[in-house]
Structure formats: C-alpha cells, structure tokens
Amino acid sequence: MSVIFRLCIALCVLYVAVLALLYFFQERLIFFPSKLESNHDFIFDRPFEEIRLDADGTWISGLKFLAQSRDGGQIYGDARDGNGERKAKNGAAIFFHGNAGNLQGWGKYARHFTDLGYDFYLFDYRGYGKSGGEIGSQERLYADADAMMQWVLRDCDAGEIAVVGHSLGSGLAARAAQKYGAKRLILIAPYFSLEELAREKMPFVPKFLIKYKIPTFEFVGGFSGPVTIFHGEHDELIGVDNSRRLLKFLKSGDKIYELNAGHNDILGLSELWEKLAQRLSE
C-alpha cells in the first residue's frame, strides 16, 4: 500500500471523525448558556414577576416586567386578562434572547418596553439560567418557544403582542410571530437561516449534518404584520448581508435599519431604541 494511499485513508478517517464530533457536539458551538442556582434572587430596578412553566418534559424560567410610566407609575387600561388583572395599555412584548447569558443579564432591556406601556416577557431557553434540561434538538428549541408564547397568550390576545428576537432568538421570534399571528415582529441582528449561517462558518460540513435549520426567511415571508429589522453594519458574527437578503421577503411598510454597530454592541445603541420606540408607536 503506497504512502499516498495510506495518507488519503487517514485523512478520510480524520474527516469523518471531525464530522461526527461536530454533529454530536454542535450544541456546544451554538449555545453558550450561563446557569443560575435555583434559589437565585433576581434584582432589577422595576417591578417584575417570576415565571416557571412546563415545556416538553422540563421547566422554563421566565420573568414578566410590568408596564410603567417613566416616573414609576404603572400604565394600565381598563381591559383585563384571563386572571382578571388589568392589561398594559399597549399590550405585551416578548423577547427571545441570544445564545449566551441568562435572564439576570437580559432583563436590563425591559425598560425600553415597560416605559412605553408594554408588559415585557423574557424567558431562558432550557439549560439557561434557572431553566431545566438542555437543548438537544431544533424540536426542543421550538417547544420552548411555543411554551413561552402560549404563556403570554394567557394574559393577552395574539394581536396585542410584539415579538422581539435578537441574534439566535431572531429565528425563534419570526417563527412565533408567524405561527401565532402576533401584532408585530422586531428582529435585531437576525440570520437568514441558521443552517446557512452554520455553513458559512463551517463550509466543509455537509448540510444534512446541521441539526438546526431555523429558516428565518420563511417565517418572515409568512408573517402578515409589520416587520422591523435592525442590523449592525460591522456585525462580525452574523453579517449584515443576512438582513439584506431578507428584504425580498418584506412587505410595504416593513423597514430595515443598518446601524453603526457590531454584533455585541448593537443593543447598547440609543439610536436603536429610539427608532424602535418610533416603530412601536406607529
């Protein structure tokens, strides 16, 4: 057996081994959860309620921040939810967060919605924060998103919900908005599809080995409500071209804003929140 032939065999075996590792451990390349102790006390500067809900064999940890005025007074109309509690005057916003951290860190963005008269719902995916279990498939991730939306639907109608997704959460948000008929959809640093993003990062991996497809473009194209997209021009993780490719799936009145930001600093831009507030008021 020639040296070249042996080398080819060795390279093929190595390639197959690498692909096997990527298939069975790809969650470690996508999800970066930060766990919290079950007795962790959340601390925020505004009123909130802690949520624990069942989702496909495990439990999901969540928070509901109550709508309030800038001077701290709660903003509620006369309508009431299924529990007899008065509803926030502008309805609810649910935020599907990115692939790292947990509720303690993501909760700081609640004020951008509660100050506008929205009750703000935020959940950790399984394996994040206080949530149990672990993500092992796209189906589990979808089950988490469904459980989150169904919880919010206990408090208000779908037509009163603004669905917001950042990074990893953008595809889940688009799916939830389309599936449940939400009022509006807001995407921040979205991917065109998670499968294509993975292929962009790892072009040597065959498509059939990528477990997480999440075709954001399909969900955006099937959503009838207003869509707003924000993307950093200098995004180094999910390039702005992902949002530009979503353009052909948008309707009249939908908007894309390209901002002077990267991936990890876009949520710190006051310009983003100012434009988001304008869109929510339309």
Region locations from a protein language model:
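Active-site nucleophile loop of the alpha/beta-hydrolase fold
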Residues: 182, 186-196, 216, 261
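Catalytic histidine-centered segment of alpha/beta-hydrolase-like enzymes
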Residues: 262-272
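Alpha/beta-hydrolase fold nucleophile elbow
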Residues: 157-167
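Short alpha-helix in the alpha/beta-hydrolase fold that links the catalytic acid
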Residues: 109, 216, 225, 239-248
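Membrane-embedded segments
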Residues: 60-68, 84-151
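An N-terminal hydrophobic leader/cap segment in hydrolases
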Residues: 7-54, 72, 81
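Short beta-strand/loop motif that positions the catalytic acidic residue
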Residues: 223-224, 229-235
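Acidic catalytic loop of the alpha/beta-hydrolase fold
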Residues: 234-238, 264-265
